[in-house]
Amino acid sequence: MELNLEPLNLPGVESKRPLVIAGPCSAETEEQVMETALQLAKNGVKVVRAGIWKPRTKPGGFEGHGAKALPWLKRVKEETGMLTTTEVATAKHVEAALEAGIDILWIGARTSANPFAVQDIADALKGVDIPVLVKNPINPDLELWVGALERVNGAGVKRIAAIHRGFSSYDKKIYRNLPMWQIPIELSRRIPNLPMICDPSHIGGRRDLIAPLCQQAMAVGMDGLMIESHCNPDNACSDANQQVSPDILDYILNMLVIRDEIQTTE
């Protein structure tokens, strides 16, 4: 199935590499969300992310505040002019996010691995013109990733991008999720006009890996970066080890070397 795609065309965001999406793993408090967003905006970030509903691996962890936190992102948009994005995993999430004026939605790795869940989300998006970002499934299955993209596009959503966040593996010697760069590269070969965004936070799982992973993503031609950033990362309620402060993020972005010629990973 050939995808019918249009450019993301994000208002107020220049169409240059890399598109940067940054913000906390979880929306913990209104103050934390606002403080992080204000610092990111000061450094030129135009799109803020925050997890509202958190699909945790095991019960008992911080699972987010749910719809209660959506007004916090609305306030961010009103006070900073930033675009907002959050993860949706059900049709109810989609409806709540749209009602709150969220600008961009993303489908997480656990959800994209489930065709039934993706189809429910796609059905909820019919008739809605909103950018949707689709993370790779947790397992290294290119066809499953393509299938999720096709389901969303089949609902009439044309502004779509893919997010590469690595793949689950029992071997976690270096990375939290193995990058397996050949898979997103093959996806880009198959669908050349599909924007590709790298999530180095979930690939690396550690702050010290974010900078080199960002550079690798640029070297293989990815269009954007989704990076977890927190105003006080050491005290984050979730994924503290992979979040960086807005100032450290700014340093990482300023150190990137962006070339027109794309390198391979061979």
Task: Report residues per predicted region.
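Catalytic domains of carbohydrate-active enzymes, especially glycoside hydrolases
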Residues: 35-52, 100
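Active-site-proximal loop/turn and secondary-structure-junction residues that shape catalytic pockets
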Residues: 26, 52-56, 90-92, 109-113, ...
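Catalytic alpha/beta core domains of metabolic enzymes, predominantly
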Residues: 13, 117-232
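Active-site mouth loops of central-metabolism enzymes
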Residues: 18-35, 59-61, 83-88, 108-109, ...
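Glycine-rich, proline-tolerant flexible connector loops at the mouths of alpha/beta enzymes
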Residues: 49-68, 230-240
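Hydrophobic faces of well-ordered beta-strands that scaffold small-molecule active sites
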Residues: 19-24, 46-50, 84-86, 105-107, ...
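Alpha-helix-loop-beta-strand connector modules within alpha/beta enzyme cores
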Residues: 62-86, 121-131, 181-196, 242-264
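N-terminal amphipathic alpha-helix/helix-capping segment at the start of soluble metabolic enzymes
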Residues: 1-21, 264-266
